[in-house]
């Protein structure tokens, strides 16, 4: 039976469970459940702390896991990223009190508070900077005010939380994170793992792409297919009027309105975008 780790709480939990449900797997009925067996798919799900998932997968106790790229990196476990899942995006950056033009070189000799000590130590080592890393499990923003640290390293979203504590982010991101599906780094190929990954990838792809259908004059077909090249090639079918063809192609969801504008501008008609629920590629 395939053994899969899922975040039990936090920002990744609900979206991870939703993707697995869309992929045809059983959901837990009670948020307090720590395990769910899905006999129809021969899978057992374990609901664990997101920070621990890479450790369990890296040890080989579990076959796959969903966690954050930042959490997997900080765990320093022998895992590899199988698939990016397209949710839970964030950046991991240094931040310090506003009012000073902070540079990465200013970290030398400083105390840096973080919930991701391994990630920070690796970054400092890569940069050749000697600093003291202080591990805290949360609310690191307050550590500077309390005199525990000079700088923090933490997940940065909108920056609102930093602003509330009069902090400013500086330097490049240590890690551009999102939810990922991981497996043990030295794991051999396995059909059961491949099947779950393919199902999940199909759901993720369906969230990121739309199917676009439109009628196109033959005279501008080359221009239209440049706008909508699809994955390998668009589908083109004749219409009753020989001067027109029907075109179908996958397009990125984020670009669909701009693409529809371009098609309309060159004379395409009846442009229709449709959601994709499930797919395999």
From Swiss-Prot:
Pathway assignment reads:
Amino-acid biosynthesis; L-histidine biosynthesis; L-histidine from 5-phospho-alpha-D-ribose 1-diphosphate: step 1/9
Q: Which GO terms describe its biological process?
A: L-histidine biosynthetic process
Location(s) in or outside the cell: Cytoplasm
Q: Which UniProt keywords apply?
A: Amino-acid biosynthesis, ATP-binding, Cytoplasm, Glycosyltransferase, Histidine biosynthesis, Magnesium, Metal-binding, Nucleotide-binding, Transferase
Report which reactions are catalysed by this protein: 1-(5-phospho-beta-D-ribosyl)-ATP + diphosphate = 5-phospho-alpha-D-ribose 1-diphosphate + ATP
Q: Which GO terms describe its cellular component?
A: cytoplasm
Q: Which Pfam families does this entry report, sorted A to Z?
A: HisG, HisG_C
Query: Which GO-annotated molecular functions does the record name?
Result: ATP binding; ATP phosphoribosyltransferase activity; magnesium ion binding
Subunit structure, briefly?
Equilibrium between an active dimeric form, an inactive hexameric form and higher aggregates. Interconversion between the various forms is largely reversible and is influenced by the natural substrates and inhibitors of the enzyme.
Family of this protein: Belongs to the ATP phosphoribosyltransferase family. Long subfamily.
Function text: Catalyzes the condensation of ATP and 5-phosphoribose 1-diphosphate to form N'-(5'-phosphoribosyl)-ATP (PR-ATP). Has a crucial role in the pathway because the rate of histidine biosynthesis seems to be controlled primarily by regulation of HisG enzymatic activity.
Please give the HAMAP family that the UniProt record associates with this protein: HisG_Long
Q: What is this protein called?
A: ATP phosphoribosyltransferase
Name of the gene: hisG
């Amino acid at each position: 039976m395939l053994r899969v780790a899922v975040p039990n709480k936090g920002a990744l939990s609900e979206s991870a469970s939703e993707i697995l449900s869309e992929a045809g797997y059983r959901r837990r009925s009670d948020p307090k459940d720590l395990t769910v067996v899905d006999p129809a798919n021969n899978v057992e799900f374990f609901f664990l702390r997101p920070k621990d998932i890479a450790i369990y997968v890296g040890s080989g106790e579990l076959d796959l896991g969903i966690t954050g790229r930042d959490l997997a990196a900080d765990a320093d476990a022998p895992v590899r990223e199988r698939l990016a899942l397209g949710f839970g995006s964030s950046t991991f950056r240094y931040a310090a009190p506003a009012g000073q033009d902070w540079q990465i070189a200013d970290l030398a000799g400083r105390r840096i508070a973080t919930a991701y000590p391994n990630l920070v130590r690796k970054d400092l080592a890569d940069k050749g900077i000697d600093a003291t890393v202080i591990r805290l499990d949360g609310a690191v923003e307050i550590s500077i005010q309390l005199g525990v640290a000079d700088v923090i390293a933490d997940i940065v979203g909108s920056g609102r939380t930093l602003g509330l504590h009069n902090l400013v982010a500086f330097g490049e991101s240590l890690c551009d994170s999102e939810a990922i599906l991981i497996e043990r780094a030295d794991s051999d190929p396995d059909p059961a793992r491949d099947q779950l990954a393919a199902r999940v990838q199909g759901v993720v792809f369906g969230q990121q792409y739309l199917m676009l259908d439109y009628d196109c004059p033959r005279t501008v077909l080359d221009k239209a297919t440049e706008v909508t090249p699809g994955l390998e090639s668009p589908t083109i079918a004749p219409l009753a009027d020989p001067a027109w063809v029907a075109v179908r192609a996958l397009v990125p969801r984020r670009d669909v309105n701009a693409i529809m504008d371009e098609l309309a501008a060159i004379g395409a008609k009846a442009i229709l975008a449709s959601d994709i629920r499930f797919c395999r590629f």
